[in-house]
Amino acid sequence: MTTTKKPKKTTRASTPIEDLPPNPFVFEVLNVVNKQRSTAKKVEALKKFEHDSLKALFIWNFDETVISLLPPGEVPYSSLKDEQNSSGTLSTKIGQQASTMRFNDTVNTNQGFTTLRREWTKLYNFIKGGNDKLNGLRRETMFIQILQGLHPLDAEILCLVKDKELQKKYKITRSMVCLLYTSDAADEHSCG
């Protein structure tokens, strides 16, 4: 009689999702989510730091029926002070600041006067059906003012969401967001 040994299943201890300070920046939450390896852990991290601002950004980014009224691409703005220091669009400057912060692995949370947690209620102004009476110039000016007040990494996220390109930088998919916000299996199939 021969006995076959069953392979031992080794389970790796699940690493806990790191804690963030109260009211974290959106980029901090997305960085924590990005570090998770499995979809289940990413969804768990998103649930842990769930906030209406994240939901609004995910809807704008992943819902095809939400149409941005802002022009796609770079945000074409620079103040006189910025032009004296360097040239380029606001998007370029935000990207440069963001990459410098990532390169130095430092985050100065004092940069920016506001956060997406506070400003998300104004996002309706930038999508079709939100505030259609607003003229294009005023809409773009409002968007630029919000970007200038945000932390550069949050501003970069808002620029990505405007163009529905959040998934190009962060490992977050539409199906992952559906898993996060659907309550039953019937709703899950409609996310497809």
Predicted region positions:
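N-terminal nucleic-acid-engaging modules of covalent nucleotidyltransferase systems
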Residues: 1-183, 190
